[in-house]
A protein has these predicted regions:
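Extracytoplasmic ligand-binding site segments that recognize negatively charged/polar headgroups
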Residues: 116, 132-146, 179-204, 248-249
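Alpha-helical, coiled-coil/dimerization segments enriched in small aliphatic residues
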Residues: 73-77, 195-224
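Short helix-initiation/N-cap motifs at beta->coil->alpha
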Residues: 34-36, 87-96, 112, 134, ...
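Proline-aspartate-enriched helix->loop->beta-strand connector
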Residues: 95-112, 126, 228-245
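Short secondary-structure boundary segments
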Residues: 52, 111-112, 133, 188, ...
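A short, structured surface patch at a secondary-structure boundary
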Residues: 47-102, 106-111
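Bacterial Sec-exported substrate-binding components of ABC uptake systems
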Residues: 2-6, 10, 17-56, 150, ...
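Structured C-terminal subdomain patch of bacterial secreted/periplasmic proteins
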Residues: 139, 145-149, 158, 239-304
């Protein structure tokens, strides 16, 4: 009899220990978001709406994709994200009826979401966490850790971050010793081909270009300025990277711009279409963007 009681007690203790170590949504979480507001969750978020493509990519990267019940219109990566309910574009009036119907326990917003939108969602009684855009790859890792904490995926995030850090280190090892840099014009938008938009100081694109071994000819101008055709001609970049290729801009079309036929990049065949999402979305695919830019600018270092 004593032996039966002993084994029953031991089994019960083991079961309790096992239950205690398993992921669970229980346990209050209190964090301060980037608007300085205390955000309280009853447990890890299980029904999440992402209001930005970068956040959607982070959620899936840390293993929380199955907890995403809504995404804004342009969240198209990873492909599985397209199976999540589309709540519409965030630059328009929010479809609050649809958002409420999804019964989210957490809505993640970023700098692409207007403060008025955050307030609108809060006024509906929804929990809204606001995240500033990171300014470095290292800060992006912090966003991954934050999202993992909110969703209960710390272990998966740690593994993903370690892999990303190793890839960045591999690029840094090859690029940092270089004493020279190739000049680059990165085109963001040529809706007005006479004054195309580019990325300047303080942008992810400039940060990644420089870390990949390039020099951005617009790095002394803040934000996303327009540059005249003459300004680009005067700078004569060694490379022109077409972040607007998906909108129909081609190496052939830019060669038709007045004066551009004599640019070094055009004459040397160094006008390259590029997937802008890899460098404009502050999420884990920034590392993909860094690798692709480094291979583009310094292919001889990445031949293996």
């Amino acid at each position: 009899m004593f032996r039966k009681i002993f084994y029953f007690t031991l089994l019960l203790a083991l079961l309790l220990t096992a239950c205690g170590s398993a992921p669970t949504p229980s346990g209050e979480i209190t964090l301060t978001d980037d608007l300085g507001r205390p955000i309280v969750l009853n447990g890890t978020a299980q029904r999440i709406i992402s209001m930005a493509p970068s956040v959607t990519e982070i959620l899936f990267a840390v293993g929380a994709g199955d907890q995403v019940v809504g995404r804004e219109q342009f969240s198209d990566y990873p492909p599985e994200a397209l199976n999540v309910t589309d709540i519409g574009a965030t630059y328009e009036a929010l479809n609050t009826e649809l958002i409420v119907s999804l019964k989210p326990d957490l809505i993640l917003t970023t700098e692409i979401n207007a403060p008025e939108q955050v307030k609108t969602l809060e006024d509906l009684g929804l929990t809204v966490y606001y995240m500033k855009n990171p300014t470095t790859i290292e800060e992006m890792y912090g966003d991954m850790e934050l999202v993992a904490q909110l969703t209960g995926h710390e272990a998966e995030a740690a593994t993903a971050i370690a892999a990303l850090k190793a890839r960045v280190a591999a690029v840094d090892e090859k690029i940092m010793p270089l004493s020279s840099r190739f000049s680059v014009f990165y085109e963001v938008d040529a809706t007005d081909p006479s004054k195309p938009y580019t990325a300047g100081k303080g942008t992810f694109i400039t940060l990644l270009l420089e870390r990949a071994g390039g020099y951005n000819i617009a790095s002394d101008i803040d934000g996303y300025p327009q540059m005249s055709l003459e300004q680009v001609v005067a700078a004569d970049p060694a490379f022109i990277i077409l972040g607007d290729a998906k909108w129909g801009t081609t190496p052939e079309s830019i060669a038709q711009r007045p004066g551009w036929e004599n640019l070094s990049a055009v004459k040397n065949g160094q006008v390259v279409p590029f997937d802008d999402d890899l460098v404009s979305r502050p999420g884990p695919r920034m590392v993909d963007g860094l690798e692709e830019l480094a291979k583009l600018l310094r292919p001889e270092l990445f031949s293996n």
